[in-house]
Amino acid sequence: MADPSASLNLVEACWRDLVLGVVQGLTEFLPISSTAHLKVVPELLGWGDPGVSVTAAIQLGSIAAVIAYFRTDLSQVLRGVSRAFRYGQWREPEARLGFAMVVGTLPILVIGLGIKFAWSQGYEQSPLRSIPSIAIVSIVMALLLALAEQVGARSKQLDVVLGRDGLLVGLAQALALLPGVSRSGSTLTAALFDGWQRADAARFSFLLGIPGITIAGLVELKDALAASPGNGPLPLLVGIGSAAVVSWLAIDWLLKFLQRNSTWLFVAYRLVFGLLLLVWWGVYGSH
């Protein structure tokens, strides 16, 4: 699918990618689906679907933000894993967290690369990326998050994470390849079902997303740049930069919010978002 920015001049392309970066930054780490909003917002603004490559490449800004925000945590994880390999200290919390991150990345890595190299064209044009599909998925995920909020024990903390926790949350992360699911939403929901405290669940979700989103962004970066040869890399850099700044703010806000509040705000938002999309599609999209 051709990138609509190919028909935009440099200023228009920079403005479009700036907006996409802001949308990406606001929605990547909140459990409301960045993919859905990056599909819907450009459609509403008349830009058309920017495509998988552009949206994946702009996610690199979010990854830069999460790496910078959690630089101390990541440094501790790397040191813990290093000690585990040298001295066999795999019971240390940092080593177990690193192992859980690796195990949790495998599902989305395998499935994501499979889609990229075996079903790329079909995925771009799949009904799964349609507005009604995104709306229905958003509503279903809202109901699952509501159930997790109700039944979750909210006792598990990040320092007791095990490989099985990483695999469970990692499988949920792989579901986010379906537009509308929300990587943050699916991982947060799975972690709540597994008995995690809200803020620790969000923290692990952010850390777990680093490898998978980084790989996806780098894989798609070449295609994203090739999609708009006339404007060069500047628009994409603007999008990545705005995504980084807004992502940092969103991470900081969400962690503080979940220390004091439940996820019901996001449940309500996703229900309303999904219902409004169905109404909009029924009025305008089905004709």
Curated annotation (Swiss-Prot):
Keywords: Antibiotic resistance, Cell inner membrane, Cell membrane, Cell shape, Cell wall biogenesis/degradation, Hydrolase, Membrane, Peptidoglycan synthesis, Transmembrane, Transmembrane helix. It is found in: Cell inner membrane. Pfam families: BacA (PF02673). The keyword S-adenosyl-L-methionine does not apply. InterPro entries: UppP. It is an enzyme of class 3 (hydrolase). GO terms for molecular function: undecaprenyl-diphosphatase activity. It comes from the Bacteria. It catalyses: di-trans,octa-cis-undecaprenyl diphosphate + H2O = di-trans,octa-cis-undecaprenyl phosphate + phosphate + H(+). Its EC number is 3.6.1.27. GO terms for cellular component: plasma membrane. The chain crosses the membrane at residues 50-70, 97-117, 131-151, 160-180, 206-226, 234-254, 264-284. It is a multi-pass membrane protein. One of its GO terms (biological process) is response to antibiotic. The keyword Cell wall biogenesis/degradation applies. Catalyzes the dephosphorylation of undecaprenyl diphosphate (UPP). Confers resistance to bacitracin. Bacitracin is thought to be involved in the inhibition of peptidoglycan synthesis by sequestering undecaprenyl diphosphate, thereby reducing the pool of lipid carrier available. HAMAP family: Undec_diphosphatase. Belongs to the UppP family. PANTHER family: UNDECAPRENYL-DIPHOSPHATASE. This is Undecaprenyl-diphosphatase.
